[in-house]
C-alpha cells in the first residue's frame, strides 16, 4: 500500500521481535498496543472483566505507521531517518491508504508517527489530523456494522470486533512550537498524544536539531492538555547520552509540571559512526529504578523503562499490564474507603 514504517527507517533494534510477532498471543505488525486508555475525566480507564476477557481471547493487533513520507527536514544527531530540505510532496490519498491497511489487518491500536515537514505551510498538522479522523471514522463504521450484524455467518466477525474500538496514538513533531498546529492534532479525535522530549535540557542542543528545543517540547505537551484534557499525553527519554541522575529527575519534574501522563526510558544506541556515540550503557536494574521513581515519586500514570524500550515498542503489552495494576490499586482503595465509611456509620 506504499506505507512507511518508522521501524525500518529509524533502524529500530526491536524490528526482528516485532515483525516476527514477539512470541505470545499478541499479533504484532510493526509495534504493539493496548486496550482503551482514556475516560471522560481524562484519567486512565479501568478495564472491565469483560474487556479483559475479550483482550485475552482476541489478543491485541497493532501497528506503527510513519506518515508524510520517509524523508525528514531535520537532522537530529541520534536519528537514522534520511533527511532533505525539500522532501517529496505529501500523498493526499494517504489517509485512505492507512485506513484500508488498518481495516485489512484488523488492528486494535495504531501508532501514527511522522517525519518533520518544516517545508510545508502547516508542517503537516492538517494531514496528521485527516489521517486520525479517517481512522476514527473507520472505527465508528466498524462499530455500527457490528451492532447491526444479526446472526448468520461468522465470516469476518473477528475482524469486525478488532476494528470495533481502534485506539489511535499520534507521535508528532513539535510543529516549531506553533500551538495552533498542535491544537489541530490534539483535537482530531486521537486517544494518546505523544511528543518526545528525547533528552535532558543541557544535552538538547547537541542531540536534537537546532530547530527543536527543550522548552518548546514542554510547551507542546502542556498545550495538548489545555485544549484536550481527556487525551493521554506521553513522551520518551533516551538514556546513555551523558545525562546525570539529577538532570533526569529535573526532566521528569518538568514533564509532570506540564501534566504529562506517560514517560518511557530506553537506551540510546548509535545507528552509525556518523551519529552521536554512546556515553553509557545503563543497566536493566537502573532502568527499573527509574520506572519505580517515575510512577511512585513523580506520579506518572505509567512508565515503561528498559534498554530496548522505544516510544511504541511493546506499548500494548506494557499498558495492559499497567491497567491491571491500576485496577487492583483503585479497587483496593475503594474497598478501604467503603470500609471506613461503614465503620463511621456504625
Which role fits each region the language model picked out?
Residues 1-55, 59-61, 106, 130-165, ...:
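Auxiliary Fe-S-binding modules of radical SAM enzymes
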Residues 6-20, 68-83:
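Local cysteine-cluster metal-coordination motifs and their immediate loop/turn environment
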Residues 62-67, 77-142, 146, 161-181, ...:
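Core AdoMet radical
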Residues 72, 116-119, 175, 242, ...:
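Short, glycine/serine-rich, charged loops/turns that create anion-binding
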Amino acid at each position: 500500500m506504499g506505507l512507511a514504517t518508522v521501524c525500518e527507517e529509524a533502524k529500530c533494534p526491536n524490528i526482528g521481535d516485532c515483525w516476527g510477532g514477539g512470541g505470545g498471543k499478541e499479533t504484532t505488525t510493526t509495534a504493539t498496543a493496548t486496550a482503551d486508555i482514556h475516560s471522560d475525566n481524562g484519567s486512565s480507564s479501568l478495564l472491565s472483566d469483560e474487556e479483559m476477557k475479550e483482550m485475552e481471547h482476541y489478543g491485541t493487533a497493532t501497528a506503527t505507521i510513519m506518515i508524510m513520507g520517509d524523508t525528514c527536514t531535520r537532522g537530529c544527531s541520534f536519528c537514522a531517518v534520511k533527511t532533505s530540505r525539500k522532501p517529496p510532496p505529501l500523498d493526499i490519498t494517504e489517509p485512505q491508504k492507512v485506513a484500508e491497511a488498518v481495516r485489512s489487518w484488523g488492528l486494535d491500536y495504531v501508532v501514527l508517527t511522522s517525519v518533520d515537514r518544516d517545508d510545508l505551510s502547516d508542517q503537516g498538522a492538517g494531514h496528521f489530523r485527516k489521517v486520525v479522523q479517517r481512522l476514527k471514522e473507520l472505527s465508528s463504521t466498524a462499530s455500527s456494522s457490528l451492532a447491526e450484524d444479526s446472526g448468520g455467518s461468522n465470516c469476518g466477525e473477528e475482524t469486525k470486533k478488532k476494528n470495533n474500538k481502534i485506539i489511535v496514538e499520534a507521535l508528532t513533531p513539535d510543529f516549531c512550537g506553533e500551538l495552533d498546529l498542535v491544537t489541530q492534532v490534539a483535537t482530531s479525535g486521537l486517544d494518546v498524544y505523544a511528543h518526545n522530549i528525547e533528552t535532558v535540557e543541557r544535552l538538547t542542543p547537541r542531540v536534537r536539531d537546532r530547530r527543536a528545543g527543550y522548552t518548546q517540547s514542554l510547551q507542546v505537551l502542556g498545550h495538548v492538555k489545555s485544549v484536550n484534557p481527556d487525551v493521554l499525553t506521553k513522551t520518551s527519554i533516551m538514556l546513555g547520552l551523558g545525562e546525570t541522575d539529577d538532570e533526569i529527575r529535573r526532566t521528569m519534574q518538568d514533564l509532570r509540571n506540564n501534566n504529562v501522563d506517560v514517560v518511557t526510558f530506553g537506551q540510546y544506541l548509535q545507528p552509525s559512526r556518523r551519529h552521536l556515540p554512546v556515553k553509557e550503557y545503563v543497566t536493566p536494574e537502573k532502568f527499573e529504578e527509574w520506572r519505580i521513581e517515575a510512577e511512585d515519586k513523580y506520579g506518572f500514570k505509567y512508565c515503561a523503562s528498559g534498554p530496548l524500550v522505544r516510544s511504541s515498542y511493546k506499548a500494548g503489552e506494557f499498558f495492559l499490564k499497567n491497567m491491571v495494576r491500576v485496577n487492583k490499586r483503585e479497587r483496593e482503595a475503594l474497598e478501604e474507603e467503603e470500609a471506613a465509611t461503614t465503620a463511621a456509620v456504625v
